[in-house]
């Protein structure tokens, strides 16, 4: 679950945890159909996915949260009433609502029994182990197990309410978002990441291609290049001389003078031409991505698929 304070506004975001695969599926559905409505999104993302389990009571709290950005989601422990060997009944608890502390809950129930604020319980034991949670609540012979359980739901954290607030910072301002708005912000953010990343890759490829074009000239005139370097009093002079003689710029000339003479003479023109050709293909690809928003959104859809199989 995401819980974050936006201090200056005195507001806190409290978003229940969700299944990653379902969330990505809903975001992809929104990319495919920007006009999708709430019911359509909820086909992919039916509700929160609490790691501790529990049972979400009804759909109205989820729907309100997704429709308005605020809602109360009631979660109950997963319980079962079973008949014990002695003819009495036990309430078995195997899952708790999200963020409920088991030890504190058991202690609280014991205090309620001791203070006679709840009737019908003779014993409570924790049999939880690595296999999972297992709390046993013994019901007195004369008591109704279902009434005892209802009282426990009303009086303890066997039933809790998760007050969801889907608050996010949008353009520097805290804003409560409904599900579609939240997913739209996510998609827009991912698109911005793809744009920036592609711009970075494009610049890197262009810079490398530019240096290689300079090296190609050096190979074509290798003897003269080596002679200029050898006859210049230092690197800075060699650089200026190369720039004047071959029309290179500072970056290209720097790349040449930084190489050892042995490296320069061993450079193969075909290797450099192959690398330039590969870079030109990449540059074309990056420019195509940057020019096409639809393409950027398709990349968003392709990339998260790997996360859903974790």
Task: For the regions a language model picked out, list residue spans one by one.
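Short, small-residue-biased leader/transition segments that mark boundaries at the very start
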Residues: 1-6
